[in-house]
Amino acid sequence: MVTGSDLNVKGDLYNNVEGDVVYEAATGKGYERSSNKSSGFGVGVYADSKNSGFTVNANTAKGYGNGETTTNANSHVTVGGTTYQNIGGDLVLDGAVVKGDHMSGQIDGAILAKSRPDTATYTGKQTNAGVSADIGFDGVPQSVSVNAGRSKVNADYAAVKEQTGIAMNSSDVVVAKASRFDGAYFTTATPEDNQTVFKEGVTTTDIQNHMNYKGDAINVGLGAGINSETQKVSPPGISGIGYGKDGDSQTSTTYSAVTGIAGKSDVTTANVGTLNETLVNSFDKDRVNAQTNAQVSVTQAFGQEAPKAVAEFSQNRINAIKADPNLTPDQKLAEIKKWDEGGVYRVAMHTAIGALGGGTVESALVGGGVAAAAPLIND
């Protein structure tokens, strides 16, 4: 057995073995395990021309990240002359490449060749929540705000980086048992140069490679307070919603080939490199988190300012309707209702602006949500 090694033979190679001959890759594993948890509490004092009191705030956050990778280092056997296979069992290539001029001899078992995909998986999640309240020295709450957020990242990758195979100029080896090539190859210089005899046949299967990752994050703020002029409690409302997402999905194929016999049979030793569509793992958890968090900040800031502009525009329309001498009182009431908070026109504007801010269905729904529950946007 040869594992993760490179062998170079200048002359001929004789495999005179009663059992199996196995060439395989060396496999390495990598693990990432992380978790975090934090909390905080603070008290301060505030004062302005109308109110004074204590500011109390508290926050908590927790999360985790789990990743696992598998990497393979193929064995390589390079023979300058003829490779004589006198094997009583199977010739097994499990993550290996055999190159030479000519292959001959008898294999009483099968040729079993397969490529090993490298793999990588990751899953992570973060949550946070915070509350802040202003309480007057008289014990009466002046305002309260709550923020909560969540972000998630998931990734999955499996792809062959170096294909398993046998690359010769010619071959007349005889194989007794049914053979199999999984994302692997047996090539010669031309189809006519491959005189290999598979007494019980040969089957080929291709390997489907994939790379998928997805991350998303959302942050929601709610607030309520006492109007400084009316001293009445304002109903709770959404003070800001931010949403972000990032992701990618790609696939490729690692093809099998036995020159002139099976699979992509037109492939020869000269162009064997065309069989493996290399797929790079472009996932970077730090970049994905940075991207989604940036989108959250932008959409949340946009969402805080845009509703105010909608409210101002709607109020101008209401004022124009009230001043329109061509409308009856009933018509004015009907039109004003459409432009009031929760009215069909204003909700439509919020929804459209939400889509502009995030470019997604989610952000459009966020915009609609602000419209339906935003009595504070006029303050």
What are these regions (language model features)?
Residues 1-357, 377:
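Binding/recognition "hotspot" determinant
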